[in-house]
Amino acid sequence: MRVSYDELKNEFKRVLLDRQLTEELAEECATAFTDTTQAGAYSHGINRFPRFIQQLEQGDIVPNAIPTKVLSLGSIEQWDAHQAIGNLTAKKMMDRAIELASQHGVGVIALRNANHWMRGGSYGWQAAEKGYIGICWTNALAVMPPWGAKECRIGTNPLIIAVPTTPITMVDMSCSMYSYGMLEVHRLAGRQTFVDAGFDDEGNLTRDPSIVEKNRRLLPMGFWKGSGLSIVLDMIATLLSNGESTVAVTEDKNDEYCVSQVFIAIEVDRLIDGKSKDEKLNRIMDYVKTAERSDPTQAVRLPGHEFTTILSDNQTNGIPVDERVWAKLKTL
């Protein structure tokens, strides 16, 4: 089924107002969730909303909290989110990183005591739309085994890198082959994952999303490489923010909150003139796109370029929503 932007936003806002959020905050939060869903990130938009409400009701999310600056070192700042709403706080932090980059050429914000930011790609895209390179990542609850282990000891720790091309080129990836949100998308669609997603109970690779959701044995992206990347991203976010690590969130909290995040903006126009920038970027993209296709019916993929098409389709034809997810939203 498909629903209109306003219909979806009104449902989000209704639920938020019922939880005593102010009119202004409910409007801002509902808009963020609707924008994410319309952009095609269903797993971190409407599908994630019930989980967001659960954490709101548990007190993990403090809706009226105001993030504060703790430390300033020129182009680097340290902030405390005080468990404010994750996606709204992340947007503010990338805005601040862009402000610093406009002054210093680069801006780095390290945030502690943050909540789940929903679609991390929104903040890289936010920077790239303004002509900046945007980089951000977050640590998370331990929901993935490190390479060589069965037990979950590392986070999926999503990493986003966005480049101001036309259209925007952006990598938005967890350190696992699939996030739990994308496993849910595949399960709801009644399909296997396109590549191996994790291990079954006997230690064999599997593409069955329901098995991996249940046993929590995600496959790290690139095997040991994704495992290693997750670990160092956690270390850096923890150090820069003076916040909680994956182990601290996992062992000291009763759910995923008080995570640590990093937002970086780079003003590339200080380093290269506009004409040269466009020529170099277009040459890279053209070189990639004109490679001989392995499947003649499938275009060579440039990361993030599909979102422009998805957004246009959803704006024209309505936003695709799984009927079961929609029914759940209506009961909240």
Swiss-Prot record:
Catalysed conversion reaction: 3-dehydro-L-gulonate + NAD(+) = 2,3-dioxo-L-gulonate + NADH + H(+); 3-dehydro-L-gulonate + NADP(+) = 2,3-dioxo-L-gulonate + NADPH + H(+)
Keyword Transferase set for record: no
Key words of the record: Cytoplasm, NAD, Oxidoreductase
Subcellular location: Cytoplasm
Gene symbol of the encoding locus: dlgD
InterPro entries, per the entry: Diketo_gul_Rdtase, Mal/L-sulf/L-lact_DH-like_ah, Mal/L-sulf/L-lact_DH-like_NADP, Mal/L-sulfo/L-lacto_DH-like_sf, Malate/L-lactate_DH-like
A Pfam family hit: Ldh_2
Keyword Repeat: no
Any one annotated GO CC term: cytoplasm
Name under which the protein is recorded: 2,3-diketo-L-gulonate reductase
Residues binding NAD(+): 168-174, 224-225, 304-306
Listed EC numbers: 1.1.1.130
Active site, per annotation: 44 (proton donor)
Gene3D superfamilies according to UniProt: 1.10.1530.10, Hypothetical oxidoreductase yiak, domain 2, Hypothetical oxidoreductase yiak, domain 3
Source superkingdom: Bacteria
Single Gene Ontology MF annotation: 3-dehydro-L-gulonate 2-dehydrogenase activity
UniProt xrefs under NCBIfam families: PRK13260.1 (NF009750)
Main location: cytoplasm
Record text on subunit structure and interactions: Homodimer.
Function: Catalyzes the reduction of 2,3-diketo-L-gulonate in the presence of NADH, to form 3-keto-L-gulonate.
Organism: Haemophilus influenzae (strain ATCC 51907 / DSM 11121 / KW20 / Rd)
Family the UniProt entry places it in: Belongs to the LDH2/MDH2 oxidoreductase family. DlgD subfamily.
